[in-house]
Amino acid sequence: MEPLHARYPFLARSREAVEAAAVDLGEIVATDETVTARALERVESAITDGTVGEPHRRTRVELLSYPVARVLVSLVDVHICTRKYAQAEAEAAYDRFTEEFATTTELKSTQRETLDRTELLGEFDLASAVSDAGDGYRVEVGAYLDLAADQRGDSWRLVNRPLTDGEVRVTAEELNVLLKQAIRHRVTDGLPFTVPDAIADELTAEVEQLEEVLSELELTREIDTVVPELFPPCMKSLLDQVQKGEHLEHHSRFAIATFLVGIGMTTDEIVDLFQVNPGFGEEATRYQVDHIRGDTSPTEYSTPACSTMQSYGDCVNMDDLCEAISHPMGYYEQKLDDTDEEELVDWREDEGEEEADA
């Protein structure tokens, strides 16, 4: 196990180093608290601040913490956790390889083994898809589309890129960003996976700690986008009932109200939405929403999980994504992630434009 393996644990040769050492993962989680603690730190830091924490000074601990972290992510089995973890690992690798790429040849000869761009391209079968273009690089359009699909901003759209003979011109920095995306794909690949009971039992405390972090964290703090067509089926149904003026049971009103608060709607906006409902009372509705938000109570309430929605009969019209998601907010976040930013039209903006036209 070499330092480079620990810095880039997703590499094939890093995985081979672990296999060559005949490491028993079950024994590791049962007896090596240092590795388990570092694995927990990787995942918890990814959730809370988008990093993988500080690397451990011992190469063995740092490297083995990676597969254990993947086990923890699989046991938690929440989309937001998986996404944040993969992104954090990719960001950490990006910071390391961009620094190493920038290191001069002279310095490399006297320092530790480093990763170069050629090896990283080969790792993801991109060596034949990327060629030097003097002041930048050319990337085959298929590879480019795959790696640029999740990038934000017009500059990444194929229509805005120089395209010649099926190849897209990119700068060195842009190629590094595409490589970061390839790493994120590699980390995400296979997650979550089935974990043997013997290993899962040893990690019960760590999984509970991560679940507590997830429950306390305001995972939707960055969401301020209201796109009803991307709502989970349960919330679409409840919103439809509200807009049709149908009566909602208390638990149903609570569910849709917490969801709307969670995605960034203000109290006034939610009150306006509920005005068509026969059970509407502005003062009571405003109080309930402010109470949910934590303005009039010591507790900020979150949207019920799918299991709770099912128990109250509010879970309807399940689709394929529902099968893989355990929380309505996770469903909505994934839908937002999967939709091109230019296609996201906030419902509140539409309402404002209609009022202006009127």
Curated annotation (Swiss-Prot):
Keywords, sorted A to Z: 4Fe-4S, DNA replication, Iron, Iron-sulfur, Metal-binding, Primosome
Biased composition (Acidic residues): 338-358
GO molecular function annotations of the record: 4 iron, 4 sulfur cluster binding; DNA-directed RNA polymerase activity; metal ion binding
Co-factor binding details: Binds 1 [4Fe-4S] cluster.
Positions of transmembrane segments: none
Transmembrane helix listed as a keyword: no
Cellular component terms per the entry's GO annotation: primosome complex
Binding site for [4Fe-4S] cluster: 234, 306, 315, 322
Disordered as annotated region, ranges: 335-358
Domain of life: Archaea
Keyword tRNA processing among UniProt keywords: no
Example GO biological process: DNA replication, synthesis of primer
InterPro entries: DNA_primase_lsu_euk/arc (IPR007238), DNA_primase_lsu_PriL (IPR023642)
Cofactor(s) essential for the protein: [4Fe-4S] cluster
Function field: Regulatory subunit of DNA primase, an RNA polymerase that catalyzes the synthesis of short RNA molecules used as primers for DNA polymerase during DNA replication. Stabilizes and modulates the activity of the small subunit, increasing the rate of DNA synthesis, and conferring RNA synthesis capability. The DNA polymerase activity may enable DNA primase to also catalyze primer extension after primer synthesis. May also play a role in DNA repair.
PANTHER family per record: DNA PRIMASE LARGE SUBUNIT
Complexes and interactors: Heterodimer of a small subunit (PriS) and a large subunit (PriL).
Family: Belongs to the eukaryotic-type primase large subunit family.
The protein, known as: DNA primase large subunit PriL
Name of the gene: priL
